[in-house]
């Protein structure tokens, strides 16, 4: 899907790239942001799992240089905006994804979050934004 002037292979790629969006064009940090885009054809652009690792919040991330920090304000609400924008672009512009979403009818949509080895319980996260987008599509 296309969003913010770039092509993205998944919402995961867009979401994690948004953590590094507010840097000056041409800077090393902005170049890191561009690695997530489909047109970069980089290793990270081809694998949502790598996108998650590159954009990881913990100190064990394997791919991101330590001096490349995520935007200070990302988790002050911008993370929610990025997720909804990415999902909206995906479902509004990709016919197959839209069809699959609509086939879920009125089901509660949840995402399983595994926290194995982190000392925390795994949990189900309700995707309210996705259900909101589905409702909008049904009302078209």
Give residue spans per PLM region.
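Charged, low-complexity intrinsically disordered segments
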Residues: 1-140
